[in-house]
Amino acid sequence: MLFAKSGTVLTISRFACAAYRRNTNFIRIPTTVIGLIDASVSIKVGVNYANYKNRLGAYHAPIHTFLDFGFLRTLPTAQIRNGFAELIKISSCAHLPTFDLLDKYAEKLIDTAFGHADGAEQEVKDASDRINRAGIHEMLKLETPNLHEIGLDRVIAYGHT
């Protein structure tokens, strides 16, 4: 199955793949900042149930993940801000140089969909590339040793309840 979406639709679709025949293959193409930076490296497919976050779920990796940051130009500003907040969390916990870039280019990154809107300055595009690569790299460093979340003391869980 091929899923080109982020958020709830992607999560529920991935959960369905994990449940159907206990492992239906899927390819994911995340389309939001959070999807590209965070969900793209995670194998957790959890859904909320009975007022509990991620109460139902599984750990099921895709056979491929395609990252196309061009999707960001299609997002409303509120979605860009949500992803920006996730990058602030990751960088403040794990990578100060990225945090400094986010601070320096904050408004320009939000106004230009992370440098992907028409007319974005090359400097902003370059900063966006560095930020996004660093965000993914840090997520991989933090997730890889604990893919199945056996250890609950996770830096990237900062702010989660």
Regions found by a protein language model. Give the residues of each.
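Anion-binding (especially nucleotide phosphate/pyrophosphate-binding) glycine-rich loop
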Residues: 1-23
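Generic hydrophobic-segment detector
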Residues: 3-4, 36, 58, 125, ...
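Hydrophobic aliphatic residue packing
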Residues: 7-9, 29, 47, 143
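Active-site segments that bind and position negatively charged phosphate/pyrophosphate groups
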Residues: 110-161
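A glycine/threonine-rich phosphate-anchoring loop and its flanking beta-alpha core
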Residues: 15-111
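Short, flexible coil/turn micro-motifs enriched in small/turn-prone residues
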Residues: 2, 9, 34-37, 52, ...
